[in-house]
Structure formats: structure tokens, C-alpha cells
Amino acid sequence: MLTFRVEKLVPGGYGLARTERGVVLVKGALPGELVRGEPKRKKGALFLEAPEILEAHPGRYPEPLPPSADLPLAYEAQLPLKEALVRDALERVAKLEAPLAPIRPSPRPLAYRTAAQYARHPLGGLAYRLPESHELHRLEKDPLLAEPLAWAFDVLKLWPLPVEEVALRGSLLEGKVLLGLVGGVPEALKRPAKALVQEGFAGVVWAEPSPKGRFRGRVTPLAGERTLLEAFGPLKATVSVESFSQVNPLAAGALLEEARTLVFGGRRALELYAGSGLFSLLLSPRYEEVVAVEISKEAVRRGEMDRKRLGAENVRFLRMDARKAEALGAFDLVVVDPPRAGLPPEVRAYLLRARPREILYVSCDPATWARDVGALVQGGYRLAFARPYDFFPFTHHVEVLSLLRL
């Protein structure tokens, strides 16, 4: 057993410590804490996943949190740590000392999530699946859930549904919740689904479990509504239980508001990894033509619904791989909001060949963002603006809004 003090927070929700055995990454540990445990080596590094905390950080959050909350610190103390993660990535990975605007806090530190997914526990109730494990962590409540999802959580704890998982998607705008039932037999779930709608759920769908990921298999409506409207700052957009939409709409709305003020406007704009096209629809009044590229059929379907509802005739959705953007030609603005892996080499190469006047880069991973920004700066761009945003309080995750210009 080793006893050691944690030095700093690093990406992934780990505290870093230097010991006689080498660097140890400690899950959920906070800077300055004294911990004890037996680190295990995996992927070439030492990890301690369940430390015994001997001396806690004075700001450690005292109330129970779900396992996903890997930054259990008083909220005001979380923000400088997250800002430091972005600054460190910018300096260490991108090799840049560009100014960083102060982090924008989440409007709500708790009760902010409008989407969540839980496993059904064999003993009843709902549980989190622990990462890289088959272990289930049973929950009595989840303080990260916004209303009305907190109501839905309490209802579902008492329903013995024959499913593997339940997924929730709510709307702060409408005050409603959609429910996804994952696994089980859809025919046997039709009657419970109708009863759940009578109980207060806006709609229920069934989803086939898939090794490819969440809602990658067959999805069948069972009862009630299929979509809801949610407000993301100045924009109202469609969400569904199977959609990949921002789970903190108040924070996402603030980012959209600021993004709109950063760009020049012009003739043509392109959004890669568009999802349902929030940026395309938001910026459509500033450009003559806007093209939204997205690979997900469901996201494109919702984007088209919103485009028609908003009357955005100059927006065009294309269901295609972002790596094939070369075929679309030149644009004044390219918006990119890639997954955590960042931009693939094909997209970075396209940007450096097409040379749009502006690149609006939104990231959910500071390290891959910094890698891509460094490559674009070496290719002739300058980082004109960057600001961290906190979409996920009580977790290590941090978003970045940035603008590059020629």
C-alpha cells in the first residue's frame, strides 16, 4: 500500500501524484489530498481507482453524488481547475501562449442535466454502470438531474420494468420528459408504456440493445410523443430520447449566444459534425448559404424538422461523413464540433487547403482541441478567441469555444 499526496488535476477525472513507484493517476482525488491505496498498472501507467482518502480537500463536496461526478468539490473551486486544464493544454500541446477568456460557469451547478441513462438494478431501482466494469452502483437520487427528470427518476425507481436500461430526455422549455426503454420485448412493453404516459411521461420508445452504442439499434415508438422542443439560448430546437443533444441547455445556450457575436458573416458557411444543426440554424441570417453535414440519420431528421419550422430556407442538411467535406468547396466560415477524438487528419487537411476566413471550433476535449489548434496555427491561422465553458459541473469535463482567423 502506498500513501501519498495528490499534486494536481489532470484530464480524465484523475488527480496526479508522484511516488517512489512513479506517477500515479488517482480517480476522483483532489489537489492536496492525502490518499492511500494499491495502484494497478494498465496501459503503461499506474492507476488508483478507489483511493482511501486520509486527508480531504477542505472544499470537498459533503453530499452524496453519482459515480459520474468525479470532481466532488465546492462549485466555485471547480472553475479555476477546469480553466487550468484548458490553459495547460494550450501551452503544453499547442505550444501557444494565446490569451484565454475566463471560464463561463454553468447557470446551474446542480439540477442541470436534461438527459440521463440508468441500468435497472437486479434488486430494484436505478443504477449507474461503473466505467470499465460490470458493477452497478445503485442510486436513491441523482442531484445532477433537472426537473422534471428528478420526478421521472423517482417514478421509475418503483416500476419493475423488464428492461436492461432506461433513458430520459427532458425539456426545460416544455417541462416534459421522454422515456426510452432499452432491452426487453417491445410487444410486452406496449401496455406499461401507455400506463407510463398516463402517469405523466410525454412519450415512450423502445430501443434494441446494440454493441455499437446507445440507440444504434432498432428504435420503436410505443406511446405518446416522439420529440420535444427545448430552448438553447435564442434558438428553439427539437430533442428526442435517442438524440445526442447538449444535456445542459442553459450553458449551451450561453455558448451559442457568444458564438453568434464572434463571426463576421458572409456568403457561405459550413458546419461539420452538425448534429441537428444548432449552429447552422443560429447563423443562417448571417450567411447566404449554410450547409450542415452530419452522419446521424436521426439528427438530420430533427434538423430538417427545425429548419422547416424556423423557415430557414438557406440551410441545407447533408447526411455524409465530415471527412468527405473536400467535395463541398470553399466557405467563408467552417464550424466544427467534433467528438472527443478531435478532428481527423482528413478534416484538418481540408481546412488548411480550403482556407476559410474563419474557423469556429467547439470542443469537448481540451487536449485534442489544442492538438488541432496547434496544427491550424502552424498552417497560417491565428487563435483569435478561446473561452472554456462548464457544461458538466462536478465532473472533470470542460468545453471550449474558440475562433481561428487567417
From Swiss-Prot:
Catalytic residues in the record: C364 (nucleophile)
Keyword field contains Zinc: no
Disulphide bridges: none
InterPro entries for the chain: MeTrfase_TrmA_AS, NA-bd_OB-fold, SAM-dependent_MTases_sf, U5_MeTrfase_fam
Binding site for S-adenosyl-L-methionine: Q246, Y273, E294, D337
Keyword list, A-Z: Methyltransferase, S-adenosyl-L-methionine, Transferase
Segments passing through the bilayer: none
Record keyword S-adenosyl-L-methionine present: yes
One Pfam family linked to the record: tRNA_U5-meth_tr
CDD domains per the UniProt record, alphabetical: AdoMet_MTases
EC code(s) of this entry: 2.1.1.-
Gene Ontology BP, a term: rRNA base methylation
A GO term for molecular function: rRNA (uridine-C5-)-methyltransferase activity
Top-level enzyme category: transferase
Family the entry assigns: Belongs to the class I-like SAM-binding methyltransferase superfamily. RNA M5U methyltransferase family.
Name of protein: Uncharacterized RNA methyltransferase TT_C0988
UniProt source species: Thermus thermophilus (strain ATCC BAA-163 / DSM 7039 / HB27)
